[in-house]
Structure formats: C-alpha cells, structure tokens
Amino acid sequence: VKRYCTQKVANQTPQRIIHLGYESTGSFQMPGVPLSSMLPAMKDFTVNRVSAIRAQVNIPVVSTNKIIWQLGANYWGSNFNLENPGTNLFAKELNNNSMTSAGINTTIFKPLNEKNFLILQASVDANGFFKSMSDINGKSLTLSATAIYGWKTSEKNMIGTGIARTYRAGQLIHVPVLFWNKTFNDRWGMELLLPAKGHLRYNFSTSNMLQAGFELEGNQFSMRLPNSQNGTVFIQRGEFKPRIMWDKKISGFIWFNVQAGLRYNYRFDVMNQYDAKKDNQRYFTSKLGNPMFFNFSLNFVSP
C-alpha cells in the first residue's frame, strides 16, 4: 500500500476554516500629498487611525490522503480616519470610502509519496475604493500564485522551495519562496513562508500558543481621482508587520487570536498606471508614519 505524507507537523497552529477579525492602528503622519497633478504644492495629513474588518473562509472541497483541495474567499476593508481632509480630493476619497480587497483563492496540497509534496496556490482579488459593483473592472484585479516543491523528513519537519507571483509588497514581484514548518520539541517550533511571513512558536499546550515574528502584506488598489493624470490612480500599499500573536482554544473548534505589533510602511506609492514601476509613472509617494497596531479575531479551525 502506497503511503503519503500529511500537510501538518506536530503541534502546528491550527488551520483556519472561518476567520473574522478587527484591526486598528494608532495615529500617524501621511506627508507629501499633492493638491493635484497640475500643482506641485504638497500637504501633510494626520491619520487618526486605520480600522479594518478582515474575514476569510477556506472550505475543503476534496480531502483524502492523496490530495487536499480547498476553495476560499477573503475580505479586507480598511477605513482611514483623517483629522482634516479639507478639499484635497485624494484625502477626501481616502477618508470617505473603504480601501477594499475582496477575492477568491484555491489551494492544493498534493503528496507525491511519504517524503515529497507539492503546494499550489492561486488567488484573484478586486482591490480599490468601490462605491458600487460597476466600479470594479479589469484594472481593479490582481492575480497572485505560488508553487512549492517540498520534503517531509519527519512528523516534525517540512521544508520546501518554489516561486511566487505576489502583490504583498504593494507592487507586483516574482520572488523565490522558502516554506519551512519545524517543531523542535514539545514547546518550541517555527512556521515560515519567506519572504511573506515567519514566526517562532511557543506551545504552552496544544490549545494555547504564543508566536513572535512578522508578516508582509498589501496589494494594489485602484482609486478614481478626477484631478489625476488619467482620472484613476493605483495605490501600491505594502506593510511590514513585526508582531506577537496569541492563539487559544475557547471551546471545541473555536479559537481566538490576539496580536499586537508595529505597522511599518514598506510602500505607499500612488501611480498613474496599472502595475506601474517607473518614476515617470508615479503621481506621488508618501512616507507614512509607523504606528502600533492591534488585531483580534475569532476562528473556526479544522480538526
């Protein structure tokens, strides 16, 4: 009988099937926002906070020892609260509408034998400031994908490498990835998917875990802006988040997660074209301040 490796290591954090969370930052500065594309004058703004609702669902479609296939959907809506947006069109749009990312994704874990496996992941997201569904078009969409080939050397160690197409840094990049989940002993372990995220894990028990690490997240968001060069700009938003996380089981398959850390501005480039990278395609760049953030979520996890 042919045997196949599983997708987990011992004492790993549980996989979330349903996730609902709230996140909030402290206040920070948003400098260098232009009055319009025709006027060189800049203005600095104070952002009192950014509050966000986050939700995710991952449903196992096929789950056998030969293959695990999941379909999912995600939502990330950020609301910027500016102290005094005034008549600046960019600041008003940012203050009055939610910066939204909503999409669908699929993940396949395919064990090849007892030692080797493949992980394939793809997602498409609609990102922008949408007042209605008609605001969503092809230039609001981003496509991300990851392919990993790996080795499971024991029930405590999985390692793999591959390549990713991602907008996590706000701008489209293709980057090699390192996947490594390892449990050192009953207390300590690590869960890495570099360069996207990485955490050192401490298990008080199998239902009570503390993690320290980071995550890089973001996307490219479209915004209609009448006074810009083309009437629409694209905000390339990337955030680097060093953080501490606490996961604990409440009852059955219901867990809570609390995290706190620093929201470091990796990128906040406002471009005149979709997937733009050149300086002459840039409307402006703002070197956002770096506030602390707090996140709380409830999660329904897999057995």
Question: Model-derived features: where do they sit?
Answer:
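Extracellular loop and loop/strand-boundary signature of outer-membrane beta-barrel proteins
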Residues: M38-D44, N88-L94, F130-D135, A164-T166, ...
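Outer-membrane beta-barrel "beta-signal"
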Residues: L178-K182, W246, K287-P303
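Transmembrane beta-strands of outer-membrane beta-barrel pores
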Residues: Y22-F28, A73-N81, V124-F130, I163-A169, ...
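Residues that define the transmembrane beta-barrel architecture of outer-membrane proteins
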Residues: V47-I53, N96-A102, N137-L143, L172-P176, ...
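Transmembrane beta-barrel domains of bacterial outer-membrane proteins
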Residues: V1-F117, Q121-S134, T142-S144, N295
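Outer-envelope beta-barrel architecture signal
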Residues: Q12-I18, N65-L71, E114-L120, E155-I159, ...
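Outer-membrane beta-barrel translocator/channel fold
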Residues: P34, N88, P195-F294
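Residue-level signature of outer-membrane beta-barrel architecture
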Residues: V57-V61, I108-K110, W151, K182, ...
